[in-house]
Amino acid sequence: MNPSLCIAVAFACPLSALAASGAPGVGFNEKPSFLGEIVQRSVDGVSDDLLTAGLGRDGIQSATPPLVSASPTATELRRLAIYNNYRALVDTTSGGGFGSLFGPLIAVDAGGRVSAPGDGKIAGTEYLAYAIDRGDDSKVTLMVQVPAHFNPKAPCIVTGTSSGSRGIYGAIGTSGEWGLQKGCAVAYADKGTGNGMHDLDTNTVGLIDGTRADAVAAGVASHFTADLTEAERTQFLASWPHRVAVKHAHSRANPEAHWGQDTLDAVRFAFFVLNETYGRRTPRGIVRTILPPNTVVIASSVSNGGGAALAAAEQDDERLIDGVAVGEPQIQLRENDAVRVVRGSQVRTGTGRPLYDYTTFANLLQPCAVLSPRAAGSPGEAFIPAALAANRCEALAAHEFITGNTPAERGDSALDALVAYGWEPESTPLTASHYAFAVPPIALTYANAYGRFGVEERVCNYSFAATDAAGTPIAWPAASAATSFGTGNGIPPAAGLQIINDASLGGPRRDGASISPSTGKLDFNVDGALCLRQLWTGGGASAREVHESVDEVQVSAQLQGRPAIIVHGRADALVPVGFTSRPYLGLNSLAEHGRSRLRYVEVTNAQHFDAFIGTATLPGYDTRFVPLHVYFRQALDLMYSHLTARTPLPPSQLVRTTPRAGTPGAAVAITAANVPPIRMKPAAADLITVRRGEVVVPD
């Protein structure tokens, strides 16, 4: 197919013509060997675009999702995915800063002319492919978006590895937003997670574009197919009907071990497609003109994607990456007791805790801690029924995890245990909402991933399925399956799927509505939570497998002299600063022997889920917390200026913000006064210092 014809039309088409144009030899553009078939989509910036899928700022902000047909097309699913992923990562309310401090702020036409303000639509070209050379059966989806106003004379690439377990559009509203607006190519990776859902009932799977197909017919085109023979699938369903296998949990691949390389592969993909378009054409082939030495490459993203960016910089032996700018990174460090973190009178020794350790600890104690009087009035407390929380407290007391005789006393004991384990006191108001919406699915998904358990093993008697009103597993509704690419986040509960407690008294039930065999009570499945915890604290082959997989994902904090900025909210209850960014700064100072160029910015009144700030069902987020996304964008601005204009980086510091006034659920609109900038010369009392592994953070 003529590549120019593909570029001229606004629908997906194979890029086989481009792939064939590279000639062997030094200096000629060649398709990387790890790439599968490349599919290309060009968008005009009017009916469709790279950043908002044609929805514009108003469409992203609307509470009404875009309509899809009964058999949704790839274009419809892409639009739905961009809509939901954008809204899942940032606060899209005007009062929260969307459309003023961040969001689709500019208009860029197909000729590259920029005007502001606008609806934020950005014309350009999108390239999509599987990375297929991982040594196992799993796949990573990669994508490159090249805006029409990309300047080949001043090329730049920003990475957008997905956060959480999200699919390929998971970073569209974070580093994707900044990079596209800046005119950079954005290199995305789903890092082997995403909405790979294998419906075992119908034996259907998702494809790279989100449409679904029969697993046998899809073959290697499947995003994820469970490792079961036909006989094994049939036998499993006979005992456990209507179950669904999910890629991150059930691929048996420990995908996190590859997240750094996945990010680097996305950058390599970006260099390839940029040179296909902008390289110098000769009779022998296309000569590469956009190269690492003349291209600004910033590794970026947030949460899991931020950790992937840091890992990529550590693993980058080709000098592809020039700098790093990340937010709230989920990063796990190799043990080193030479690291110390001091905040006021609090001193913590060592490099924090692994994700599975602290998440399974939270999974046990958080539903009891919500009964602490100190957590009263927290956003989301209505989602944690007090009677069930009291039952969890009773079970924990029986197992001697906590003390106390009343629910309030036991809640205090559980909250004290969380703070003693490493959570900041500022995260207390987040306990209820995080348990309600985040912690249990993360604990379960990573138990499966680190233990390399298949769907048929039902680790700790858990599985995934759709349910009826009573919580009983039912067939996954066809409409939910068909739109799962656009609505899911890669980690059930999502896309109509729920977590099932297969050991519930009376038969399998939705986890939150199940009855624990050991207590005979509704207590948020304490038996399952204890089992997940035992995979970290206990012995046996499964626990050893989990520990070995965690060892595989731990990093050294050796950034090889690259400049880097980490921004993190002090109140983060999902990826606490004491387990991640603070000790990373200390370990980096040891790894780079005092020659580090890493800066760490901690932000008061900021936490992990900016999208919760504007969520109507979580009143109180808006009057307590400011958007960390403001500082993530600032970090990218500062890094870009440092790399292009040699402006100095600011010192590590604490930024003291001011929450919005008003009543919970009706906060006044945010202004710049609520979110003061990162300072080039912060007050002495706000400096964060690091020396020989010791990090000192202002109180």
UniProtKB/Swiss-Prot annotation:
EC numbers on record: 3.1.1.22
Record-annotated active site: S303 (charge relay system)
Signal peptide region: 1-19
Keyword Kinase: no
Keywords noted in UniProt: Hydrolase, Secreted, Signal
UniProt-recorded Gene Ontology molecular function terms: hydroxybutyrate-dimer hydrolase activity
Subcellular location as annotated: Secreted
Entry keyword annotation includes Cell wall biogenesis/degradation: no
Coiled coil: none
GO BP annotations listed: butyrate metabolic process
InterPro entries: AB_hydrolase_fold, OHBut_olig_hydro_put
Annotated pathway: Lipid metabolism; butanoate metabolism
GO CC terms in record: extracellular space
Reaction catalyzed: (3R)-hydroxybutanoate dimer + H2O = 2 (R)-3-hydroxybutanoate + H(+)
General function of this protein: Participates in the degradation of poly-3-hydroxybutyrate (PHB). It works downstream of poly(3-hydroxybutyrate) depolymerase, hydrolyzing D(-)-3-hydroxybutyrate oligomers of various length (3HB-oligomers) into 3HB-monomers.
Similarity comment: Belongs to the D-(-)-3-hydroxybutyrate oligomer hydrolase family.
Name used for this protein in its record: D-(-)-3-hydroxybutyrate oligomer hydrolase
Protein source organism: Azoarcus sp. (strain BH72)
